[in-house]
Structure formats: C-alpha cells, structure tokens
C-alpha cells in the first residue's frame, strides 16, 4: 500500500477485511456540481441560467412589431475575494451581463420584414457565487443551501386506504404533478363515479374534461368500453360470443348450441366451461330477450327517414325500444360490456351525472370552477383551458416528469413533449379504471424512485426564472408603448426584480441556512443534508409517519441513522457516503456487477427504480481469491426484502460495508454493536463537538477521519508536489517540482493560513502547519491542520482513560466525574470568539458620535478606551464594560430651574446627548483580539480607523513583498543556473544587486535570449506586484458600502478561553452523553497498580439498558492501543535498536485475521521509523470500519500483545483510602467530546429587569434577562412546607404586584426590611378577561 507523506508519519492500523473497491468520493460534490451546472454556459439549454433565459426569451411586444432576443451571457469578475466579503459583511457575487438583441419588424400586408437590429450587453444584477467549499457568503455570513427531496413530477396512482368513507371502501385517485403548472387529479367517489379536480378545486365529473377535449358521448364510450353485439335473427336474439366475457357469471338460461347444453341454467360459469366453448369454436349463442333488456347501448340509433333519435348512447334498452329498432330494420345492436368483477361501468355511470352535453358547456363548467364570479365568454373559456395544460408558458412537466409519466403508463418512449396531450389524459383515466378493476397496483409515494433531489443550482435557476418573468411583463409593455427607434435593450431591462428574487432566495429561503460551523464534520454534514421541508415540499405539521420512516429504497442513498431528534425527525436526512444524484435528480448508489457467481470490478450506479429488478448481495458476503462467492446460498436484497438466493441468481453486490450510512454515522467505531437510537444520538452529537485547543486524534477511528478532514476544506492541502521552502505559523511556501510547473512561472505555491478567526458558532478557526522545512510533499498532502484536525485526520475530542464504576453518587443519572488533571493539561480547553458591533447612525436630531466623551461615566469605566472611544486590543473586559463609547443626541426636554442653572454655568453640551455605548453583555468576559472600523464614504475617518488602515496596509505590503521576494529568488535561481552553465563565477554575481544581473554581457545568442526572456518575466512580475499592492490599497482606503442611514460600524472581537467545568455537557460517540458533576482532585481518583489514575469515571448502569455496547468495545480496544503505545514509548526511552523497534511495530500492524491492510515497514527508512514510533508512543491509532470492524478475538489478541488482561478489566484502588475496590473494573481509553452546551452560556441570574406589558410579570429567558418561572408544582412545594410568607412574596412583590415591588425597592434602600404585598396584576387581567365575556365582576372591599 502506498502512503502519502503525512500518512507515513502516523499509520492507522486497519482492521477492515473486505477489499476496497471504490474510493470514497469527494464529499461536497453534490453542492459544487449542482452550482457548476447553474453557472456554466450550457449550449444544449437544458440547465442553469441558459435554460432560464431560453424559456423566457424571445419576448414579443403585444402588437408583434418587435421582439427582444437573448444571445448569450457572461459572469463578470468579483470585486472582493471571500475573506474580504466576510470581513466587510458583503455578498460574494459576480455581476451578470447578458447580450440581448432588439429586432424591429416592418409590417407588410403579407409578411414581416426586419427593419432594424440593435445588440447590447445589459447588466442583470449580481449572482452569488459558491466558494470552493460549497458555501455562499451572503452579507458577510457563510450560508449553505440544503438540497431538497421533493415529489418528482409525473403521474401518481394512490388510494385513501379506506380511511375517507365510513364504509371502509377503498377510493382510488390519480394525480398528475407538473414541475410547474396546475395539478390534475382524478378520483373515485364511494358510488364509483370518476371525478376530476384542477388545482384541488371543486370536483367535476371526469366526462367534463373529456368533452372539453372535444369527445362526444359515443366516442367516450368507444374509448373506455368493449362492445357486446346482439343480432336479431328469425325473431330470436343471438349474441356474438366472446367466451372470456362470461367468466364468473351465473347462467340465467341454458347455454346451448346445436342441441348440446354447455352450461345449465343457474350454474356458475367457470374456466372449464369457457375452455369447452372455445374448443368447440362456438361463435354465437341464442339468448332470451330478458338477457338484453337493461343493457346499455353504445351508440345513437337514429331513424334515417325522420332523423328522430330512437335511443341515444349510454341509455338502457327496454322492450318497446327493442321492438321499435326491430321495426326500423336495426338487426344488430351494440351494447357496452360491463360486469362487477373486472369491467366496471364507471365512465358510463359518470356520464349520467354530467350535466354538460357539448364542448362549450364543459368549458364553461371548468371556467366557473377556476374563475368563480367572472362571466364566461367563448374566447375566455377556450384560452383558460388551453393555458391550463397545453401551453408551454404555463405548464411544464419537465424531462423528469415526462420520463416518469411515460414509465408509469408503461410506454416505450421516455422522451416527449413537456405539456400534456389528449392521449396522456385518456391513458391516465384508463389506468386508474384498470386499478379500480383490480389490474395493476397503486404507487408507493415514499419510494425514492418517486422522490427526487433538487439541489442548489436547480433552486437558484427556478428563482432566477421567477425574476425574469417579472421583468418580461415590463419589457412587453415597453415594446408595445415605447418609441422603438430610440429604445435600446438597456432601457427596457430593470435588473432590480431579478436581483431581488435571487437575493430573497439566498437570504431568506427556508433552505438557505446559516452554516453549522461547530467543527469540520458539522460543515460537511450540513452540505450533504437533504430536507423534505421548504418551498414546494412538506410542512412539519402535515408530514405523517410514513414519510418520516426508513424505506427499503433508502439503502445506500439516504442514511437510516442520522436525522435530528424532535419535530423534524425523518424529514431531514443525510446523504449516504457513496450516494450521488443522476441526471434526472434521483439518488443512485454504486454496486459491483456479478455474473454467474463471479464478482467483477465493474461498478454500476443504480437508482431506486432500476434497483427493484435486481438481486443484490451484501458487502460482507464471502468471496474467494478468484472473486467467486464461496457459499451456495447468499443473503441478498430483492424488491426491498431480504432472503437467501442461489449464488448464480445474484446480479450485483454492495461496494462497501459503509455504503448504507452517512459520513457522520460512518465515524462511529463499532456502530454495529450500538442500538439504533443511540447511534442516532452519537452521530448528531459529534456535530456539536467544540474544537479543542490541543487536538488529539481518536485512538479508535473508522478510517473515514482523513476523508472528512481533507474534504471539509478546513485543512490546507497541497495543490502540487514539491519541497517545503519556508514555513511559519501563518504561511507555508512550497517550491513546486519542475514536472508540475506551468511554462513561464516561478514555480512557487504560497499557502496563507487562517489564524484565530470566528466561526458562525463563535468557535475558533485556526490553522497550524504540520510540515517542516525541506520536507518533500506530494499533491493532496495535508500541509496545515485546521480546527479539530490532527495530522490531517478529524479529531473532535480527546482520548480519555475511563473507568466504568460508581463513585460516591457523583455519576448518578449519567453524570460524569472528571479528574483535575484533565483541566491542568488543558485537554478540553476551547477558545470562543464573539463579535460585538456598534453602529453609529444618522438620526433626525443629528448624527450619533463615537467618542470617549460620555456623559455621567466615571474615569474607571473609560480606562480601557483610547481617545477615539474604542477599546484597546489586548484589554481584558468583563460584563458591563464599555467597548465603544457612543453618544446619541436627544430631543429637547423641559428643563427644571436647577438644570437651567447648571447649563448656564457649564455650557450646554453636557446634557443634550445620551449614552448609548456598546457594552459587554452580562456574563460575558474575554480579551479583545481585534477591532475593525467601517466608515461610510464621505464621512471623516477617526484616528483609530486610520491607525488600523495603516496597519493593514503595512501587513499587506509586507506579505506581498515577501511573496515577491520568494518569486524573485526562485527566478534568479534559474538565472544562476544559466550563468553556471556559462562558467561565470557566481561569487562575483552574488556581490551584484539582482537588477544588475540582466546587464551582464553574454556572447552566446541562445543564452542571451534566455536571460532576456527571464528579464522580461521579472519585469512582468514586478508590474503585477505593484498592481496588486495598488488594488489592495484602494480596497482598504476606500469608504465602505453601508446600509442607508449608517455612518460607521465598529466591530470588536472578544476571545475567551474556557476550561472544562461542572455543568458542561460531554459525550462519547455512541450516544453516551452526560453532564460533569464534579472535578475531582487527582489524588482522589481511582488508580491502578502502576499508580496511574483514571481521567473519567462513568456509570456502568448507563450501558445495559441503552444497549450501546460499542463504547465498551471501544474502551477495550483503546486500552490495547494505548498499551502498545506504552511499549513503543518504553523502547524509545531505553534507546532500543531501530531494527527491534521496526520488528515490534511490524508485529503490531500484522495482528488480526486476514486483514486487507498490508504494512511493510522494510520500505521505510530509519528516520521514518523513528518518526513513526514517536507518533505512536501515545497509542497506536486503530481503524475499525463500520460493519467490518475488529472482532472480539482480535481485541483479545491486541490486549495480549500489549501485555494486558484479555478480560479488559483490572484491579483499581480507591484514591482516598488506598484500598482495593472489591472487584476488577473495566478501564480503557474512550474518545470523549465536549459539546457546545457550555454552562457559561447557560448560567443566568436576574436581579431587576424588564416586565411583560400585559401581565407585568418578569420576562423569561436569558436573552431578555428574564426570571425563572415559579410554576404550579413549585407553588405546591411551598404549600407543602407551609412557607406562607415565601409563597406570598413569590406571587406578589417578586412577580407582578406593581406597587408592592416599587415600595419594596424603596424599603430596601431605606433599610426597612418589610413588604406590603398588594394586588397581583394578573388578577386584574383575569377580571378584565371575565368582563370581556360580558360578566360583570367587581371586588368588594370589606
């Protein structure tokens, strides 16, 4: 196995047995590919902006004299890069410029000739761009657009499962759902009449839509029914026999022919009888006249002489009409063939309740339903019906919809028109009748073949189209009214509606969400999330149980584990590891092809629809070396069910054991031993882990950690191979290998690292280099670790030594007892950065001013501010401290004589402003790490702003100069090589300044040319460098684009280090969560016979009932890993020979049964072995992939190899008494996370604060500085204790007795500790409420 440079530093021992067939795909591709489709010009016009433009353009004027045509579009350059947008609070977007052509026609009588053509590029608003990590920067914050799982367009057949009608009769319905346009529903009622609804309006008989499609009654009956033909011969009635139609009927007469009785009267006609009739080739039988009476004729019978209709179609035959027909010479009568079994008379019955009789009346009926109250005219009714389903502007099935529609109706062709036609509607009615007749089945709505994924690109395109349609109306009017000779395309297009539509989508759509940036995993999961909510999706309240449930088609597409707990359960899902969307938007998953029991390396992606036809083996099926199944019977899935199949029947096999789970769930080791509910919590809680100050890779991982860390984009990854030329905390410089260099470039890659930046969740983003000078690196290697990554692997928490035992009740109910050592070593210390803003506005009374001159504030409070009134960087501040001094002008007030006197003495400035400074919120403290000032264009910058500007300019100049020097020196190394090849003394060259090198006289022409070429390159480099500096300088010094009425914004960043403390929430990866109850001194913790104390004590009762046994296996294997690490550490300390070290490590990697990982340490140099050993001394990292992990016997082997008891339990001693505990205790290493539910953020106490307006009770919640609710049960508690005075003050002065609480305050100030409770305000509210009901209620004072 080939290891990359970073992987060689620390190899993870892999317990996986199944071969790796397919690498884990790039985890953010669903976002990036979708947006790429939207942005990139698509010549076919199927996707993205191109499709939107083509669907709206050309726009014709109402009079047809002119049209505006679309030619092409291009996206301009962005003004600010991603980081600048985040700092400035701007949107990362690019201007959209569209080339339009205005064509004006000369109207002749016969044809239109072109009179004039004008082409122009028009600005059409800004399009937000996606960053490389799949996010958008909207108003400075990073957002993610979540993909939506919605019902695919097409036709769906469903039933109410007998719930609608009291009789329990199953009513079937069909629904045609377009991508955009009106829905068309067909439904049966309990009387078996078929109805149609348009857009869920009032229902109409289905015949109305058929008449509107220009069918008359006869044609309708012809389409939907087979005919029985009766002939009148020799005064007898003869039926032309189709034997099949008699099945299941009871013979009401003897069925005989040529004297032979085939079926006796009263007998039920069976398949045997029918076969007999067929065998004897009986084509007709004589029937009694009663048999034809009551039958329904299928066409109109008209007297040819008089033109009188004797009997019209869909009418029952009676004896007299039969006589009439016979008299008039109609000797052949066609009737409808219906029966109760499989040919129901539904359409015929429906025609009877239909009041309309021709196309016009049907159209009027439809018009009345769609536009109630408007008078119908012929033209209006026809237009309305035409526009509903047959006009491309108003109705679009989309390619997906057409494909699903045709597949549902079992048609061969999957392509077709995007609107409906007559055949479509008739085929749907035929199919729903077939289903009612018992042929065919209803669809499963929750099948992933009926739900598709709409990603960012598609949603943005829909929004953009909405904007274009708004513009279209305005353009049409302009084209019709305006003076066309002077008009240019630019005058017609207003970009505002388009910008507004796009902005609204990215800013406030339910699916455009504030990115969850707790840690790299939460970022990746957020981008891979699939939601059933949102525009055109479900709502929480209406979503039933079925939609939320796991469906067999989720296998390998949507994770069955990771979904939120609470009201959104099952509506928000996560994409499985290998899943992707196909061109139609359906989720598909990869499988290996199997032929005659031989598993090939060929991989096919199947969607849920395609998968239904195949037999698919699981990933852990046993295969021999040649690729054949070893067992004759293999467990497989087929049509959503699991059972055993012969190995030669198998068509496909899973690609990997991790295929069914999402990224989050695939990070849980021993997931297969956890109960599903706990696994769900484990997957969700990993997303809440706060990045710790010191990262620590998990000892027990699953092998997915590297993929997550690299794909999330928080690490710096090498773009090209090369050598590390320079490295410091904020920059890495790589000298690129020559074979990867582009022509005429310096061959230098510079990676600037992110330092101590705030994330969306107020955690800290910081990158640290993990390479050293002179190291050779390959493309794709990790150069710098980001938050929660350690040597390019995801590291969300810390490996803790845990013991499962009770300890003095401190781990009752999932509490956690933690050793003080954890705090001392800063194991769970995290950094949190908060941003506080102060906005100075222009008010009616004048501008607000930021200054240190604040009324009624003492010197002490201003001690941390500079002369501009802004806090110093590095100042330590706590709740209530002023960060930015700001005064607001206040309106003139009537002054008291004393105030007038003071004004006269001290001048008037003092009191016409009020203090509105930015203060540190209560309960927050920290260090100021950065201040940024944004000033509106045209407003004078204060001293501090100019200082900050200077600093930024200096830093940028320094950075760019260093970059330039690096490029320059690289260039001069090339020149030096040229000189050396000419035998020129380089020592003399070194004394000359670089610029003089180009003027050295060289005789050889080719070399001279080369030097000239390099000189030109140097000149270009310098020009570019100066240009860059100028651009940056302009960006920094120009005014900022602030919201209307805002003059200045000052942003202050506070950082605070939080150590772990009682009340913080911690969790493992198996859903085992708890709150820290106590931080115990190290000396009191239980310790083993070597004197090593444990870090954490967990309650053993938390395991059996929760059934998350994975944590125990993790603990045991962690112990073994640490034990092996200790042995390596011992060998390093005693300076064992490297050969022995190599042997020992090799042995450790070879442990286990038929593993796929083959590590050959003989290929490693001695230095590499030493470096590996140093990284393994704290424990050998182990990977145990999901469903393919370490077995029990392998864990025992590891424990034995580490010299530990194979039971995993050891004797512990009580730290307080030194006595042995009475039985061995499970001790080992578990990976623990600190979750973002910190007690510091939740602690809250109210003194005096705001009150609710109506009830006059204190508000609730920390944000409102509210109180704690003293509820019904708490009142009972005080009553039970008989604490009447306490209860009285709780219900009055401490709550809503307005006068009482004011007096109380006064009494306390005066030192008089008495209270005078009065009437609680809520009692008055009750009185008012009762009076509002018209009951007069008054209090009588005694």
Swiss-Prot record:
Matching CDD domains: RNA_pol_B_RPB2
A Pfam family it matches: RNA_pol_Rpb2_7
Q: What is its EC number?
A: 2.7.7.6
Q: Which reaction does it catalyse?
A: RNA(n) + a ribonucleoside 5'-triphosphate = RNA(n+1) + diphosphate
Q: Which UniProt keywords apply?
A: DNA-directed RNA polymerase, Nucleotidyltransferase, Transcription, Transferase
Keyword Transferase on this protein? Answer: yes
* GO BP annotation list: DNA-templated transcription
**Cellular component per GO, a single term:** DNA-directed RNA polymerase complex
According to its UniProt entry, what is the function of this protein?
Answer: DNA-dependent RNA polymerase catalyzes the transcription of DNA into RNA using the four ribonucleoside triphosphates as substrates.
Q: What is this protein called?
A: DNA-directed RNA polymerase subunit beta
Which source organism? Buchnera aphidicola subsp. Acyrthosiphon pisum (strain 5A)
């Amino acid at each position: 196995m080939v290891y990359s440079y970073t992987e060689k530093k620390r190899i993870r021992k892999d317990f996986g047995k199944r071969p790796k067939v397919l690498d884990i795909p790039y985890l953010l591709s669903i976002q990036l590919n979708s947006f790429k489709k939207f942005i990139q010009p698509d010549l076919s016009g199927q996707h993205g902006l191109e499709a939107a433009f083509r669907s709206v353009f050309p726009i014709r004027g109402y009079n047809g004299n002119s049209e505006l045509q679309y030619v092409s579009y291009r996206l301009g350059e962005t003004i600010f890069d991603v980081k600048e947008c985040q700092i400035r609070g701007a949107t990362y977007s690019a201007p959209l410029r569209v080339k339009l052509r205005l064509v004006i026609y000369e109207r002749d009588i016969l044809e239109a000739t072109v009179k004039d053509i004008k082409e122009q590029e028009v600005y059409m608003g800004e399009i937000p761009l996606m960053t490389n990590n799949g996010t958008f920067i909207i108003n400075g914050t990073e957002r993610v657009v979540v993909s939506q799982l919605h019902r695919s367009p097409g036709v769906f057949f469903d039933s109410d499962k007998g719930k609608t009608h009291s009789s329990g009769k199953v009513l079937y319905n069909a629904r045609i759902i377009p991508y955009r346009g009106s829905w068309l529903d067909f439904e049966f009622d309990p009387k078996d009449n078929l109805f149609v609804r348009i857009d869920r309006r009032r229902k109409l008989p289905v015949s109305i839509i058929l008449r509107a499609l220009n069918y008359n009654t006869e044609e309708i009956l012809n389409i939907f029914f087979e005919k029985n033909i009766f002939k009148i011969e020799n005064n007898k009635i003869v039926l032309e026999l189709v034997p099949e139609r008699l099945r299941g009927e009871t013979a009401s007469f003897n069925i005989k022919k040529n004297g032979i009785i085939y079926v006796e009267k009263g007998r039920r006609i069976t398949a045997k009888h029918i076969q007999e009739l067929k065998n004897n080739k009986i084509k007709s039988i004589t029937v009694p006249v009663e048999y034809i009476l009551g039958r329904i004729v299928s066409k109109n019978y008209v007297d040819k002489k008089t033109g009188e209709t004797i009997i019209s179609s869909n009418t029952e035959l009676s004896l007299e009409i039969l006589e009439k027909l016979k008299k008039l010479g109609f000797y052949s009568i066609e009737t409808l063939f219906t029966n109760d079994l499989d040919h129901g008379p539904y359409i015929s019955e429906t025609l009877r309740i239909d009041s309309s009789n021709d196309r016009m009346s049907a159209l009027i009926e439809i018009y009345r339903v769609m536009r109630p109250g408007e008078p119908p005219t012929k033209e209006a009714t026809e237009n309305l019906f035409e526009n509903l389903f047959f006009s491309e502007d108003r109705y679009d099935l989309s390619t997906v919809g057409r494909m699903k529609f045709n597949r549902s109706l079992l048609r061969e062709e999957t392509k077709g028109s995007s609107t409906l036609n007559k055949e479509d509607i008739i085929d749907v009615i035929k199919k729903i009748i077939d289903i009612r007749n018992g042929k065919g089945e209803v669809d499963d709505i929750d099948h992933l073949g009926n739900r598709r994924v709409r990603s960012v690109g598609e949603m943005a395109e829909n929004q953009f189209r909405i904007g274009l349609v708004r513009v279209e109306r305005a353009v049409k009017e302009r084209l019709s009214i305006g003076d066309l000779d002077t008009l240019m395309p630019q005058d017609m297009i207003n970009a505002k509606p388009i910008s507004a539509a796009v902005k609204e989508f990215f800013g406030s759509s339910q699916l455009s969400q504030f990115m969850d940036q707790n840690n790299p995993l939460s970022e990746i999961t957020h981008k891979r999330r699939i939601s059933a909510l949102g525009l055109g999706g479900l709502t929480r309240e209406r979503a039933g149980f079925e939609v939320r449930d796991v469906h067999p088609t989720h296998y390998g597409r949507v994770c069955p584990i990771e979904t939120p707990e609470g009201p959104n359960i099952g509506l928000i899902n996560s994409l499985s590891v290998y899943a992707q969307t196909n061109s139609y938007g359906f989720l598909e998953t990869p499988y290996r092809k199997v032929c005659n029991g031989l598993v090939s390396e060929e991989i096919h992606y199947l969607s849920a629809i395609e998968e239904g036809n195949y037999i698919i083996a699981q990933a852990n099926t046993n295969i021999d070396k040649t690729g054949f199944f070893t067992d004759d019977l293999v467990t497989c899935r087929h049509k959503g069910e699991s059972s055993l199949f012969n190995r030669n029947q198998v068509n496909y096999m899973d690609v990997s054991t991790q295929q069914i789970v999402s990224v989050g769930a695939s990070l849980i080791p021993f997931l297969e031993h956890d109960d599903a509910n706990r696994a769900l919590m484990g997957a969700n809680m990993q997303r809440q882990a706060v990045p710790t100050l010191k990262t620590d890779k998990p000892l027990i991982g699953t092998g997915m950690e590297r993929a997550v860390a690299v794909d999330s984009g928080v690490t710096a990854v090498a773009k090209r191979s090369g050598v590390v030329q320079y490295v410091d905390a904020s920059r890495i410089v790589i000298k690129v290998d020559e074979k990867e260099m582009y022509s005429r470039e310096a061959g230098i890659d510079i990676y600037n690292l992110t330092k101590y930046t705030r994330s969306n969740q107020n955690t800290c983003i910081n990158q640290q280099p993990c390479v050293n000078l002179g190291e050779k690196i390959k493309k794709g290697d990790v150069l710098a670790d980001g938050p929660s990554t350690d040597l390019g692997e995801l590291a969300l928490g810390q490996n803790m030594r845990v013991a499962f035992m009770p300890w003095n009740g401190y781990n009752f109910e999932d509490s956690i007892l933690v050793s003080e050592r954890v705090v001392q070593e800063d194991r769970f210390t995290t950094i949190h950065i908060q941003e506080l803003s102060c906005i100075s506005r222009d008010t009616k009374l004048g501008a607000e001013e930021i200054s240190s001159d604040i009324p009624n504030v003492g010197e002490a409070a201003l001690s941390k501010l500079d002369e501009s009134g802004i806090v110093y960087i590095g100042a330590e501040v706590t709740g209530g401290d002023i960060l930015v001094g700001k005064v607001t002008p206040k309106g003139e007030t009537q002054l008291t004589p004393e105030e007038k006197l003071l004004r006269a003495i001290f001048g008037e400035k003092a009191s016409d402003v009020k203090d509105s400074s930015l203060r540190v919120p209560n309960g927050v403290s920290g260090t100021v790490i950065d201040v940024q000032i944004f000033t509106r264009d045209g407003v004078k910058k204060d001293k501090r702003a100019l200082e900050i500007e200077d600093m930024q300019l200096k830093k940028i100049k320094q950075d760019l100069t260093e970059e330039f020097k690096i490029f320059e020196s690289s260039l001069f190394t090339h020149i030096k090589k040229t000189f050396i090849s000419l035998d020129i003394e380089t020592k003399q060259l070194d004394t000359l300044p670089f610029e003089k090198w180009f003027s050295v006289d060289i005789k050889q022409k080719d070399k001279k040319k080369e030097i000239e070429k390099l000189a030109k390159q140097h000149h270009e480099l310098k020009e570019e460098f100066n240009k860059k500096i100028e651009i940056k300088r302009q960006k920094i010094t120009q005014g900022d684009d602030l919201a209307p009425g805002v003059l200045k914004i000052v942003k202050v960043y506070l950082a605070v280090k939080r150590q772990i403390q009682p009340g913080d929430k911690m969790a493992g990866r198996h859903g085992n969560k708890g709150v820290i109850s106590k931080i115990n001194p190290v000396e009191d913790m239980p310790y083993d016979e070597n004197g090593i104390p444990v870090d954490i004590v967990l309650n053993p009762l938390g395991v059996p009932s929760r059934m998350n046994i994975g944590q125990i296996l993790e603990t045991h294997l962690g112990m073994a890993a640490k034990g092996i690490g200790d042995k390596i550490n011992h060998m390093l300390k005693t300076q064992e020979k490297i050969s022995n070290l190599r042997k020992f490590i090799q042995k450790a990697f070879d442990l286990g049964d038929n593993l796929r990982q083959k590590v050959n340490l003989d290929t490693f140099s001695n230095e590499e072995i030493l470096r590996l050993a140093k990284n393994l001394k704290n424990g050998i990292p182990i990977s145990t992939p999901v469903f393919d992990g370490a077995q029990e016997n392998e864990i025992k082997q590891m424990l034995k190899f580490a010299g530990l008891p194979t039971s995993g339990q050891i004797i512990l001693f009580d730290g307080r008494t030194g006595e042995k505990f009475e039985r061995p205790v499970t001790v080992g290493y578990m990976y623990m996370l600190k979750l973002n539910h910190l007690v510091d953020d939740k602690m809250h106490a109210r003194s005096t604060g705001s009150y609710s307006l109506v009830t006059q009770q204190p508000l609730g919640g920390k944000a409102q500085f509210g109180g704690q609710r003293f509820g019904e049960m708490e009142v009972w508690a005080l009553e039970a204790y008989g604490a009447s005075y306490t209860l009285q003050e709780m219900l009055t002065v401490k709550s809503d007795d307005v006068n009482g609480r004011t007096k109380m305050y006064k009494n306390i100030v005066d030192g008089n500790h008495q209270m005078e409770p009065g009437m609680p305000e809520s009692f008055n509210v009750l009185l008012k409420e009762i009076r509002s009901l018209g009951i007069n209620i008054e209090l009588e004072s005694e």
